Design a protein with these regions (language model features):
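Hydrophobic transmembrane alpha-helices of multi-pass small-molecule transporters
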Residues: 59, 174-178, 204-208, 280-283, ...
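Transmembrane helical elements of multi-pass membrane transporters/channels
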Residues: 15-34, 136, 147, 170, ...
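Residue-level signal for short hydrophobic patches within transmembrane helices
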Residues: 6, 10-29, 33, 56, ...
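Short alpha-helical transmembrane segments in multi-pass integral membrane proteins
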Residues: 1-17, 75-142, 184-240, 296-364, ...
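Small-residue-rich hydrophobic transmembrane alpha-helices
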Residues: 47-107, 144-163, 270-332, 368-390
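Transmembrane alpha-helix boundary and packing residues in multipass membrane permease domains
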Residues: 20, 24, 36, 73, ...
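Helix-terminus/linker motif at the lipid-water interface of multi-pass membrane proteins
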Residues: 25, 29-48, 117-124, 180-187, ...
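Short runs within selected transmembrane alpha-helices of multi-pass transporters and secretion channels
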Residues: 68, 136-155, 163-171, 192-205, ...
Length: 444
């Protein structure tokens, strides 16, 4: 556990972000491994089918993950001011809320898979792959939920190393079983799904064991697992804006996915592969932003606004430098990166489409870095409603720009919509920060 209320802000943020960054990259690596192995050994249609499930999976889990993130803000602020009793009651309430929501979302995912896939206009030649993958993932979704809940608690009290170890272990498990199930056992798309489930359960066990070991330090007790209505309300109140924002982002992703699907399986495969590259590349920005949010949460509990301001401005400098470096790497190696997923002889068109996507997204990483910096200060301070509005603004921009520009520029218009939506997402957090109103939104 790490106290961020003392010491040099930037050093604390970077030291906290590095394990998280490595963990996030490993988490993305096993997503990439799924994509590479499916694309190389099962073909373009299977890749498009598995890839088209991403927004659906995210949508149905967004409510639970949003609650975990919202409760994490309260945990960070309780830890910052040393209120163990309030921290423990918040965690207890989170367990009950997440448990109920997981059961509901799992049933919806299992029985509604085909309906949602047809709603997304998934082509007939890939819908079978998509449905098979979703049924397995949602039958065993509890592993992902336990990991996300425990990781949120550990990150909030300054422990980013345990989630790192969990993700590294799960990545190894995922890659090993991907190869075994798909290549050796010839299980097809089902093999990729089962490998993912085993990986998620591995990370869940590691993080749960760590939370169990430090339960006394953060005030948890086996005798106090009865939920209190006031804390259930607190978790729902703080988690709902994040959950709602996540759901809306997922809906936006589904809208964009539906638009992408209308251009055919080659475009779908290109979108899946390029998205995997983008997801890995942007983790530096995401990890530093998350660390800044935890730093803000702990320091606002002690009214240390000068430290938060110093952290923001220094983090912005790091974000800009990191964004330029990452963009350069993506632009230079974009063709080689796409060829990791797709065979140049069989999927030349898809590789070209994916390279265009990476070029447009890469040059806009600086905008994403600025957006993440301001949004995470506001989020860490507990101003969750402003974050929700900012997220909805970004989402609305993405959908509107995608549908407008695709009619003029074709699929390239969809790619351009993302950096334009990031620009929209910057406006509200920047205005809110300089208004100073976020200083009065602390949760603990």
């Amino acid at each position: 556990m790490k106290d961020m209320t003392q010491g040099k802000p930037l050093k604390l943020i970077i030291c906290f972000a590095i394990p998280m960054l490595i963990g996030n990259i490993f988490q993305q690596i096993y997503n990439v491994a799924d994509t590479v192995i499916v694309g190389r050994f099962l073909g373009e249609s299977a890749l498009a089918g598995v890839g088209s499930t991403g927004t659906l999976t995210y949508f149905l889990l967004a409510l639970v993950s949003g609650m975990c993130n919202g409760a994490g803000l309260v945990v960070a602020q309780c830890f910052g001011c040393g209120n163990k009793e309030r921290l423990a009651k918040t965690v207890t309430a989170l367990v009950w809320v997440a448990g109920v929501l997981t059961c509901i979302m799992s049933l919806i995912g299992i029985f509604g898979a085909e309906f949602f896939l047809r709603l997304l206009s998934v082509p007939e030649n890939v819908i079978g792959y998509s449905a098979e993958y979703l049924h397995i993932i949602y039958t065993f979704v509890f592993g992902s939920v336990i990991y996300n809940g425990c990781a949120a608690i550990l990150n909030s009290v300054g422990d980013s190393k345990t989630p790192l170890r969990a993700v590294i272990a799960s990545s190894v498990v995922n890659i090993a079983f991907d190869l075994f199930f798909i290549i050796v056992c010839k299980m097809g798309v089902a093999g990729a799904a089962y490998a993912t489930i085993l990986a998620q359960c591995t990370s869940a066990v590691i993080c749960f064991v760590k939370v169990w070991k430090v339960r006394a330090e953060i005030g948890l007790s086996l005798m106090k697992w009865k939920p209190e209505a006031g804390y259930i309300h607190l978790v729902v109140k703080t988690g709902f804006p994040a959950a709602f924002q996540s759901c809306m982002i997922a809906l936006g992703g589904m809208s964009v996915q539906r638009l992408v699907n209308s251009f055919g399986s080659s475009t779908m495969a290109a979108y899946v592969a390029a998205n995997r590259v983008d997801s890995v590349a942007i983790q530096v920005i995401v990890s530093i932003g998350t660390a800044l949010s935890v730093f803000t949460g702990q320091n606002i509990a002690k009214n240390q606004y000068d430290r938060i301001r110093e952290a923001l401005y220094k983090t912005l400098g790091v974000m800009v430098g990191a964004s330029i470096f990452i963009a350069s790497m993506v632009l230079i190696f974009r063709v080689q990166l796409m060829m990791l997923f797709l065979d140049a002889n069989e999927s030349g068109e898809a590789i070209g489409i994916g390279c265009t996507y990476l070029t447009i997204i890469g040059v806009a990483y600086v905008i994403a870095g600025v957006m993440q910096s301001y949004q995470n200060v506001i989020r860490g301070a507990g101003d969750v409603n402003t974050c929700m509005v900012a997220g909805l603004t970004e989402l609305s921009g993405r959908i509107v720009f995608a549908y407008l520009l695709s009619g003029i520029l074709g699929v390239t218009g969809i790619w351009i919509a993302t950096p334009l939506s990031w620009s929209c997402g910057c406006i509200i957090p920047v205005i809110r920060y300089y208004s100073g109103k976020w200083k009065h939104k602390r949760l603990a």
